């Protein structure tokens, strides 16, 4: 064989070995699926035999010279370009160019990459994937903008205490409140905290009716200023609830804020024995629906109407019970930093305690921390909470003018809790049998001057004065809800308890005085014993033994006989 043919054969073998080294080095970096397709390239003599054994899918030549082909040409050296086979050898897969890093895989340079992977690589490049060390794992990559948008859809309750509001969505520093997101975006204007609400929070689209699915409507039990109340049985637990449906759709911004305002008040008040319990709320068919506790005794207004028809009235003892229980509810509301501003008979509900089949053990009632838990009849504040506002940042909406305090009409909000006391005093007067209260006119002003309406029944002087003091023209002179809860007029047992407490404190003081005198006497006796003569007895009586030193100048006994001594 001549020299030219030998040189040509050696050159061809060198080219093949060079391709084999490149394919081996890249095979270690490629994914497992690319390792199978990128096998070592045989020499040209064995090309037909290897192709007969395995023929992978081929990309048409037009696709090879399409997307990404110019990048491959730029990365190849001039020597590699000379060794690249021509169009006639497109059946043999070429080795793709080595990627810049392990994390980047140029799918378009491999003729065996499906088009679906090519499209996914283009789409995924526009999204921000979560880091490997992230604690929150997602099945699908979610853009960062979506997470900010979902956080911004969380309403902030305006009645939530400021210290708690800063923490309730910032657990471990991972979540941000809606206000923080708004401050982070300088393009958005400042929005009042909690208002307006995001529209999508109040709408449920493409969903079955939750009201019809979860509840069985029994009857309509009331109609208020803001909605209609229905008695319903929940299909899951079989318990009875009061479901309130807003009268007007919440599509408008003002109606939407009003509906959310009532939900906010219900949610923050929580659970108290003298406040109707709130369970949940949702939007359905553009109406707000609130699930509350059901009170089987109806409203106080219904009971007053029945008494008026029958010519009866609540006795004074019952009136004191109503006043005391509602005062406890108002005390809880005022301590929560809010005022009701719509106290009236239609917003007070009655709950009769259900009798159990088994008798109640007396010890169980005695061990209760609160006396009202054993009461047979409970009075609770409920109704429309659309007028509830904050004491520190009031946004007052006037309630029923018949029970409205004059200072609210004059926009004097320095003593907002006392406006609830004024309305409660008139409510008890109506329950006592007073005629219907005027909405305006001379009689309206006469009551605001501190005069109770005419009450047909005779009340005790102390109770009458208490009611009169509750509607005092000066709100600062009215008692507080906490003061009413401690009133001796409403709780006569407190007087006896206070007397016993005073006697106990007096006896404790006497005992403490005696103990102090005893300690002083003991301290004075101890130094006297230390400085006394050791040879002299310190006690006049002979019961105390004396100490006598042995030896030295002490007298020694001269008789050791056991018999009788001689005279």
Curated annotation (Swiss-Prot):
What this protein catalyses is: L-tyrosyl-[protein] + ATP = O-phospho-L-tyrosyl-[protein] + ADP + H(+)
Out of the domains of life, which is the source? Eukaryota
One GO biological process this protein is involved in is: female pronucleus assembly
Renumbered to this chain, the Basic and acidic residues biased-composition regions fall at 1-12, 26-36, 507-520
- Segments carrying motif Nuclear export signal: 318-332
Q: Spell out the PROSITE patterns in the cross-references.
A: PROTEIN_KINASE_ATP (PS00107), PROTEIN_KINASE_DOM (PS50011), PROTEIN_KINASE_ST (PS00108)
Location relative to the cell: Nucleus
Q: Which UniProt keywords apply?
A: ATP-binding, Coiled coil, Kinase, Magnesium, Meiosis, Metal-binding, Nucleotide-binding, Nucleus, Phosphoprotein, Transferase, Tyrosine-protein kinase
Q: Which Gene3D superfamilies match?
A: Phosphorylase Kinase, domain 1 (3.30.200.20), Transferase(Phosphotransferase) domain 1 (1.10.510.10)
Q: Give residues annotated as binding ATP.
A: 221-229, 244
Coiled coil ranges (UniProt) are: 497-523
What does the UniProt PTM comment say about this protein?
Answer: Phosphorylation leads to increase its activity.
GO MF terms listed in the record are: ATP binding; magnesium ion binding; non-membrane spanning protein tyrosine kinase activity; protein tyrosine kinase activity
Family note: Belongs to the protein kinase superfamily. Ser/Thr protein kinase family. WEE1 subfamily.
State the name under which the record lists this protein. Answer: Wee1-like protein kinase 2
Gene assigned in the entry: WEE2
């Amino acid at each position: 064989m001549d020299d030219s043919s030998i040189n040509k054969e050696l050159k061809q073998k060198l080219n093949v070995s060079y391709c084999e080294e490149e394919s081996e080095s890249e095979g270690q970096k490629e994914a497992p699926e690319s390792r199978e397709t990128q096998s070592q390239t045989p020499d040209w003599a064995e090309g037909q035999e290897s192709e007969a054994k395995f023929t992978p899918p081929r990309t048409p030549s037009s696709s090879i010279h399409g997307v990404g082909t110019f990048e491959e040409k730029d990365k190849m050296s001039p020597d590699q370009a000379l060794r690249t086979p021509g169009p006639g050898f497109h059946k043999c897969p070429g080795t793709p160019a080595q990627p810049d890093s392990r994390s980047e895989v140029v799918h378009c340079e491999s003729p065996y990459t499906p088009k679906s992977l090519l499209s996914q690589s283009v789409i995924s490049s526009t999204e921000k994937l979560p880091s490997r060390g992230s604690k929150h794992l997602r099945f699908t990559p979610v853009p960062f903008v979506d997470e900010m948008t979902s956080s911004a859809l969380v309403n902030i309750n305006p009645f939530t205490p400021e210290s708690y509001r800063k923490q309730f969505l910032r657990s471990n520093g991972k979540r941000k409140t809606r206000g923080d997101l708004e401050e982070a975006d300088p393009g958005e204007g400042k929005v009042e905290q909690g208002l307006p609400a995001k529209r999508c929070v109040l709408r449920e689209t493409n969903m079955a009716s939750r009201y019809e699915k979860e509840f069985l409507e029994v009857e309509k039990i009331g109609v208020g200023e803001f909605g209609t109340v229905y008695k319903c049985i929940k299909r899951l637990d079989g318990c009875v609830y009061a479901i309130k449906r807003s009268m007007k759709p919440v599509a408008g911004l003002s109606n939407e804020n009003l509906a959310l305002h009532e939900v906010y008040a219900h949610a923050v008040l929580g659970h108290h024995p003298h406040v109707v319990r709130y369970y949940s709320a949702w939007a359905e068919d553009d109406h707000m629906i609130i699930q509350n506790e059901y009170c089987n005794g109806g409203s106080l207004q219904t009971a007053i109407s029945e008494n008026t028809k029958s010519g009866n009235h609540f006795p004074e003892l019952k009136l004191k019970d109503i006043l005391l229980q509602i005062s406890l509810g108002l005390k809880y509301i005022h301590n929560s930093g809010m005022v009701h501003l719509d106290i009236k008979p239609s917003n007070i509900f009655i709950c009769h305690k259900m009798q159990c089949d088994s008798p109640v053990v007396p010890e169980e009632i005695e061990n209760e921390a609160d006396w009202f838990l054993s009461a047979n009849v409970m009075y609770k504040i409920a109704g429309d909470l659309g007028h509830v506002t904050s004491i520190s940042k009031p946004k007052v909406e006037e309630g029923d003018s018949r029970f409205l305090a004059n200072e609210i009409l004059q926009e004097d909000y320095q003593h907002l809790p006392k406006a609830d006391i004024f309305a409660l005093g008139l409510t008890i007067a109506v329950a006592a049998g007073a005629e219907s209260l005027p909405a305006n006119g001379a009689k309206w002003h006469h009551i605001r001057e501190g005069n109770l309406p005419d009450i047909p029944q005779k009340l005790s002087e102390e109770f009458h004065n208490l009611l009169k003091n509750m509607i005092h023209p000066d709100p600062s002179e009215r008692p507080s809800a906490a003061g009413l809860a401690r009133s001796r007029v409403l709780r006569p047992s407190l007087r006896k308890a206070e007397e016993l407490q005073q006697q106990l404190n007096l006896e404790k003081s006497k005992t403490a005085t005696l103990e102090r005198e005893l300690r002083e006497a003991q301290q004075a006796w101890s130094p006297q014993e230390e400085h006394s003569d050791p040879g002299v007895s310190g006690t006049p009586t002979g019961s105390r033994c004396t100490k006598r030193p042995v030896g030295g100048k002490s007298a020694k006994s001269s008789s050791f006989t056991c018999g009788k001594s001689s005279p």
